[in-house]
């Protein structure tokens, strides 16, 4: 009988049985140890249960502990509001960052998303484990800007808890050169990258980049003439339409269909003077861009205007042959705006969702560019002279060469001057 009793007590773990009407507090005995005397107090870390006829167990507090834990968890989950799908309008200066996209598990190269995720967690918008696995919050960015590239109109989509004063709380945990400028609710399946119809980038550069090589001037005295500006815009307009840009990126051959991209517009605005140095802004709008593409588009036009390359190189660069296309510095590149025309047509006026046009935020976007992006680009250019250093490499390029691709038409020969950082939003 003693062995059977001990077996029963062991089966019920920490809760002890009361057999019959007499209460008992008999913990499981080891070996031949004597049970505690009658009336001894039960240890405080033990709970007892009472038995009823038929062997039913009745817990003294009236409820099975497992059920209590389960109902408590349900109650806690009910207290948390459901996450909602939103988009955030972001602006940031890319100097000092290794691009936009986060590299989970790597702290060596800091990215914009590292600071963003930290701010989302600290403000209470997402749980901490969502920062470790961004798929849990359905995170997606419109464009994957790379090392040193800034943005005035980046848009990311994600699921968050819509806490009170959400923008103020997120921004309070961000450095001043990263700002969330707007927030809108979107459909549950919205993906900022896939829903984006087009991207607009701008490239800020000193106008002495267009000075002819025979009278090259790289100081504050140079001013862009109307004739040269007209020539620049004529060449930039040649990019409009669909072309094969395999020579404007890396690791893509002429037979790769993804190398064909559609450019809606590209032009250079009137120059302006900052801190005694004249600058101009080149704007380009396209459905999507590959890594290095915009910088190489700018670089080739600069090489033509300066007299290093013939205009015919533009047409050749879209053909199947390998063409040496120079890549302008990344400092002046800025993601200015992303476009959602098709989404706005379908959902923008359905009475449930707002159109993603950000018209009310344009003032804040312009102010951020004037305060953080343009001063950083202009100041860095004056201090480091990245454009002047790059211009000195143009004579090294051989624009008349017509080398065939190695290993057949599907492989691309990498340029010896090609670096690792660039611009790209789809590849």
Swiss-Prot record:
Residue positions where Phosphoserine is found in the record: 415, 420
Region entry Disordered, spans: 20-83, 407-427
Effect of residue 101 to R: In MLASA1; uncertain significance
Catalytic activity entry: a uridine in tRNA = a pseudouridine in tRNA; uridine(38/39/40) in tRNA = pseudouridine(38/39/40) in tRNA; a uridine in mRNA = a pseudouridine in mRNA
Protein name stated in the entry: Pseudouridylate synthase 1 homolog
Pfam families (alphabetical): PseudoU_synth_1
GO CC annotations, alphabetized: cytoplasm; mitochondrial matrix; mitochondrion; nucleolus; nucleoplasm; nucleus; transcription regulator complex
Catalytic center residues: 146 (nucleophile)
EC class name: isomerase
Modified residues (Phosphothreonine): 426
Tissue expression: Widely expressed. High levels of expression found in brain and skeletal muscle.
Annotated keywords: Cytoplasm, Disease variant, Isomerase, Mitochondrion, mRNA processing, mRNA splicing, Nucleus, Phosphoprotein, Primary mitochondrial disease, Transit peptide, tRNA processing
NCBIfam families linked to this entry: hisT_truA
Mutation effect (residue 295 to Q): In MLASA1; uncertain significance; mild phenotype
Assembly behavior: Monomer. Forms a complex with RARG and the SRA1 RNA in the nucleus.
Cystine residue pairs: none
Annotated Basic and acidic residues bias: 44-79
Lineage of the species this protein comes from: Eukaryota, Metazoa, Chordata, Craniata, Vertebrata
Free-text function comment from the UniProt entry: Pseudouridylate synthase that catalyzes pseudouridylation of tRNAs and mRNAs. Acts on positions 27/28 in the anticodon stem and also positions 34 and 36 in the anticodon of an intron containing tRNA. Also catalyzes pseudouridylation of mRNAs: mediates pseudouridylation of mRNAs with the consensus sequence 5'-UGUAG-3'. Acts as a regulator of pre-mRNA splicing by mediating pseudouridylation of pre-mRNAs at locations associated with alternatively spliced regions. Pseudouridylation of pre-mRNAs near splice sites directly regulates mRNA splicing and mRNA 3'-end processing.
Similarity-based family: Belongs to the tRNA pseudouridine synthase TruA family.
Matching SUPFAM superfamilies: Pseudouridine synthase (SSF55120)
Keyword Cell inner membrane attached: no
């Amino acid at each position: 009988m003693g062995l059977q009793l001990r077996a029963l007590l062991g089966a019920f773990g920490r809760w002890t049985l009361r057999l019959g009407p007499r209460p008992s507090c008999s913990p499981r005995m080891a070996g031949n140890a004597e049970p505690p005397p009658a009336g001894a107090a039960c240890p405080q870390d033990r709970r007892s249960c009472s038995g009823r006829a038929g062997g039913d167990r009745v817990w003294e507090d009236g409820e099975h502990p497992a059920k209590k834990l389960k109902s408590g968890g349900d109650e806690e989950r009910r207290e948390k509001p459901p996450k909602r799908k939103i988009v955030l309008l972001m602006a940031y200066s890319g100097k000092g960052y290794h691009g936009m996209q986060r590299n989970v598990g790597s702290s060596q190269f800091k990215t914009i998303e590292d600071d963003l995720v930290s701010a989302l967690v600290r403000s209470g918008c997402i749980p901490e484990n969502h920062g470790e696995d961004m798929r849990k919050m359905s995170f997606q960015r419109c464009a994957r800007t790379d090392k040193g590239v800034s943005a005035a109109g980046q848009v990311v989509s994600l699921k968050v808890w819509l806490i009170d004063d959400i923008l103020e709380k997120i921004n309070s945990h961000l450095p001043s050169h990263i700002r969330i400028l707007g927030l809108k609710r979107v459909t549950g399946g919205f993906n900022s990258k896939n829903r984006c119809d087009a991207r607009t980038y701008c490239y800020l550069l000193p106008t002495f980049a267009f000075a002819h090589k025979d009278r090259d001037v790289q100081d504050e005295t140079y001013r862009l003439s109307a004739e040269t500006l007209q020539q620049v815009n004529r060449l930039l307009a040649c990019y409009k339409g669909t072309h094969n840009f395999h020579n404007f990126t890396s690791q893509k051959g002429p037979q790769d269909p993804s190398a064909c991209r559609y450019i809606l517009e590209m032009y250079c605005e009137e120059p302006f003077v900052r801190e005694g140095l004249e600058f101009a802004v080149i704007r380009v709008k396209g459905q999507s861009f590959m890594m290095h593409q915009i910088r190489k588009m700018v670089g080739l036009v600069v090489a033509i205007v300066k007299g290093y390359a013939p205009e015919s190189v533009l047409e050749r660069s879209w053909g199947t042959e390998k063409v040496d296309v120079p890549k302008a510095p990344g400092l002046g590149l800025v993601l200015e705006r992303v476009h959602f025309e098709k989404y706005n047509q379908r959902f923008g006026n359905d009475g449930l969702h707002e159109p993603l046009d950000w018209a009310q935020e344009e003032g804040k976007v312009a102010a951020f560019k004037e305060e953080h992006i343009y001063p950083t680009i202009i100041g860095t250019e004056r201090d480091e002279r990245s454009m002047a250093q790059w211009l000195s490499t143009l004579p090294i390029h051989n624009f008349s060469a017509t080398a065939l691709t190695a290993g057949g038409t599907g492989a691309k020969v990498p340029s010896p001057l090609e670096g690792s950082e660039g611009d790209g939003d789809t590849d």
